[in-house]
Amino acid sequence: MKKIFLLQLVLITLCSCKKLDKPTVFDNEYATNFSIHSEDNRLSITSAGTNMQIPLDYKCKKCIITTTSASAYIDALGEINTIVGVCSPHYFYNTKIQEKLKNHSIEDIGNDGTINFEKILALKPDLIITDHNPNYEKILNQLSRQGIKILYVEEFMEIHPLGKTEYLKLFGTVFNQIKKADSLYSFVKKNYEALKEKTSQVTIRPKVFTGIMYGDSWYMAGGKSFLSTLFRDSGAQYLWDDTNKSGSVPLRFEEVLSKGKNAEYWIGAGNFKSKKEMLNLKYELCMD
């Protein structure tokens, strides 16, 4: 009897130790704006300063997205069919999404100014993936009270390109595709680091700048932004690399022209489809 009791005690102890050995945190390598913790058989996701809790076996079946970047992660994981609504559909260049918009398997639920509460409710999504848009907050709070989960994603705040890539893990968690997400992330990371090693040896670095005018200001990516890191790692010399900002830096056109006129490349020049569209008085000066 004592032997049976001791055996049971050992088994219980081993089981308890096994539970304690489970990881309680999914460690990020580059991303700083989200974290995932395991708590009492649930996953606690903190992203963009907000928290969402889901069961360990959670899998999103129907979602609404308000940002184009979310569609890229979802598509990479093979979960594009879970999207039932998007915001500002004219911004989406994904051909699968455009096709689904035409046949109404994906609905237009609003724009940057507002989202349609009744339409979203009728679509019955499990999850809304969005960013912090003050125009949405009141309606999102109402939808949250209806039991719809809200996941805030702001990958654009990351300061390293692989930090943005690492959001595959966040999307992999909510779509129950973590193995695929890890595999994709590792593949991109391996290739990125290999190319970075090659470009670290270059002696001639072309000068580049980015951005366009919005109103009276030219918004230039800061020196601590993911774009600045991407330019540096790809072998370019970013002319605003010395600005200590992770977001955009508003500049007067004259400031951009003074420094940018000697650049070899203007990268990320907005939504212009041709040089002709850019040839107004100011932009033409940048290309002389």
PLM regions and their residue ranges:
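A short, structured surface patch at a secondary-structure boundary
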Residues: L43-S47, L56, K61-L121, L127-H132
